[in-house]
């Protein structure tokens, strides 16, 4: 407090509290009721929710915090769980889990009988495949797309694969198989340049060149329709790429 003309004056600082968006979201259907203009606020709330939980629970912060906007955009734009979504590695899935009905149990993350640290098909229909470490997503989403085509289904198929995962033999085998088909599959490379160990090798250098404007893409050389590098924290760029 301060004294003015001999009288104590108390200053009370009030922070304007915005109505919580996350409190009202327990499914992608709830998410779609939010306007696009409100999505940045929801991103902030999701980050705070995850940080608050993991300040007292074990878990992996970096991978999930890096895909907050992507997680929101995927469930906002696509029709999950009918549209199949695979996260590889599974550490990226925290926001996905919170948005798909597991928010109220998220405090039990990685505890006995609690929320799994990775996607789990036994846990939720939104977890299309049980991914852990790592590199299985491309092959899995390919065979799911083949199976759905044989059944006459027209749903979408999306795999989000990390920077360190896509350089593995299994992921490259999956890309080699997928490009030989005409399946409607979307592969999203989360190139955050982060792995357990420092990234090394030819693909590391190639991804760096792509980020700096190189037009010679390994993915186009494979035969994929390659959208290019986008800002994964920009809803405008994400929705444009999905279109």
What are these regions (language model features)?
Residues 127-243:
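Glycine-rich ThDP/TPP pyrophosphate-binding loop and its adjacent helix/strand module
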Residues 3-14:
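Short, positively charged and aromatic/hydrophobic N-terminal segments
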Residues 18-21, 27-30, 57, 61, ...:
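Glycine-rich, flexible loop/turn motifs
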Residues 42, 60-181:
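Cofactor-binding active-site loop characterized by glycine-rich and histidine/acidic residues
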Residues 11, 88-90, 190:
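Structured loops at beta-to-helix junctions and adjacent beta-edge loops in soluble globular domains
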Residues 20-27, 49-53, 116-128, 215-224:
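Gly-rich Lys/Arg/Thr-decorated short loops/hinges at beta-loop-alpha junctions or inter-strand turns
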Residues 18-98, 231-239:
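N-terminal amphipathic, basic-rich helices that act as targeting or association modules
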